Amino acid sequence: MPTLLTRKLEQTLPPIKSGDNVARVKYFTPWSTWTWYAAEASAELEDGSEVPLSDPRARDRVDVMFWGVVFGHEKEYGYWRLSDLAEIRGPMGLMIERDLYFHSTPLDQCQDPTARHR
């Protein structure tokens, strides 16, 4: 299974609170319609501080915090951690996946995965 966050993807994600509104990574649950579009990300350090993923201190991170839009029960902008995504398990042990074919998309154009079924 592909990794949820590669070094190459890390280089494309601006730090949290940079004001960027372009999703660069898409995560989804293969057993439901939950979908996360990440526009910004920062490394969380052991002392609780956050630094850009491009910062050399990010190598010693304890987690990665994302900001973007989530389509779950409803559309919601907010924050989530990489570790939270990695811990989620669905039926038969299914895990969150990264859309390998996703291209950067403005957040306001990201699609609700259930919209076409309404």
What are these regions (language model features)?
Residues 39-91:
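Acidic, aromatic-enriched beta-alpha/helix-loop junctions
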